[in-house]
């Protein structure tokens, strides 16, 4: 594979997604390999010790995929991504990152900067295990998320009581 300035394709869009997710912002995510995409590719290549020619051959593509896999894995572990862990920054991967950022009070810009990575790689160990009979703010948080996903929490909605509904 070889992607160069002037190309227009879905692969270019996925390249742009990947670059943006890794904080090498190509500005547009439209599948058009323009000057900004070339500059982002060069910055990425330089940072990874690759030949900085702005062209995306197998070496650059495979390195990009290997950098995306940990993000996909973390997003999948957090329940935001349900696709294949393949390193391709497709629409589902990119949208999962933006949704994760939005849900966690982060800037939803699709760039996995330090704040996003810190939040993505932490576990919520300070939250209690919820079970039938549990009450409180964590139950409300769970119920609210379930309702948002289209599930019913009984006639009372998010009432803070973990019941049969």
Language-model segments: residues:
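Cell-envelope/ECM-targeting effectors and their regulatory/trafficking segments
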Residues: 1-165
